[in-house]
Amino acid sequence: TRRVLRTMEVVHLCRKAGFSVTTRTKLQNEAPQDEDIVILDTIGELGKIYSIGDVVFVGGSLVPHGGHNILEPAAHGKAIIVGSHMFNFKDTYALFKNRDACLTVKNGAELATEVTRLFDEPEHRHRMEEETRAIVRENKGASRKSAVLLHQMLDAYESSPENRHHVRSTQKITNFQTYFIDLV
């Protein structure tokens, strides 16, 4: 497990707001008690958790730290909410934002309002989910296509007479492509 500095503070805030809450670490040792909220205080489980939620808030995006990757909850076809600090995934964010597949909030109050609205208006949430799934479908295989294109470009570059003395990079790209495809 990782050391999450604010875990107990967040647990306290949730309880103060009237929610029953537990942590992922506690659930490893105790049976769940139908808690309203489970706080993740472990590493490597966020992707699995996205699959069971209805609405996903992408953390890190309410502060100038930069948000997490939208593609993780999108892979599960979720309604996504982000803060305004998505500069580290600006192209991906723009794609989802321009197609109304994610909502952007400025602060915690707006976040609460939008989460509530998505549950009060399930048809809006379902439209967002459909658009998210469409974006994922349309972009499936993009990494492989990019690697193939890069391989072709490098091959053409290295085949030109003025560049024949350079070390061939295309074998490295082929190796990378094989490795990367194994990951996705």
Give the ranges of each region predicted by the language model.
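Nucleotide-activated sugar donor-binding and catalytic core shared by glycosyltransferases
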Residues: 1-184
